[in-house]
A protein has these predicted regions:
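N-terminal pre-core extensions flanking Radical SAM catalytic domains
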Residues: 2-4
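The canonical Cys-X-X-Cys-His
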Residues: 13-17, 74
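Active-site beta-to-alpha loop of glycosyltransferases that engages the nucleotide-sugar donor
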Residues: 8-11
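Non-cysteine beta-strand/loop elements that form the S-adenosyl-L-methionine
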Residues: 154-167
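Conserved Radical SAM active-site core
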Residues: 22-155
Length: 168
């Protein structure tokens, strides 16, 4: 299966296995174990989004415009852009690259995240376009979305995987 990760989540689980997908927008993330604290990211940021204090180098995501200057100049590859703005057509084109594999294996595409239903209109359009291409569809969801959305999603899905977060 091909997995398309959509950013944005309506829960903040302490044990989240995809914390980079919590915020809905693309963001610059730092892998602290690779950071040498050279300060180049802070020097090159034209918006003052990167700064340091006793805790180390931090990013103010409200100031960051994701220009990539800090990523390009990081000598230790500690910075990366997580998430990309894509159109429905771009996503479906990527998914269709694996069409031969799907036909041989019975696979398809799974939309995951974060919580894919956070981007419900985009998700619905992607599912519809994949179905038009004859691609089997699935979502991995926490199930925490409006009931009305279920009626719109159901006809476009072959599988629904519900990730149960907690039971009492």
């Amino acid at each position: 299966r091909t997995v398309v990760f959509l950013k944005g989540c309506n829960q903040v689980c302490l044990w989240c296995h995809n914390p980079e997908s919590l915020l809905p927008a693309p963001q610059v993330l730092r892998k602290d174990s690779l950071c040498t604290r050279c300060g180049r990211c802070e020097e090159v940021c034209p918006h003052g989004a990167v700064f340091h204090n006793d805790a180390g180098f931090l990013t103010d995501h409200t100031k960051c415009v994701r220009c990539g200057h800090c990523i390009d100049l990081c000598p230790s590859d500690a910075l990366m852009l997580v998430g990309y703005d894509k159109t429905v057509e771009e996503v479906v084109k990527l998914v269709c690259k694996d069409r031969d594999f799907y036909q041989r294996t019975g696979g398809g595409v799974t939309f995951s995240g974060g919580e894919p239903a956070v981007q419900s209109e985009f998700l619905l359009q992607c599912l519809e376009a994949c179905r038009e291409q004859g691609i089997q569809t699935a979502i991995e969801t926490n199930g925490n979305y409006p009931l009305e959305l279920t009626a719109r999603l159901s006809p476009l899905l072959d599988y629904v995987m519900v990730d149960v977060k907690h039971t009492d």
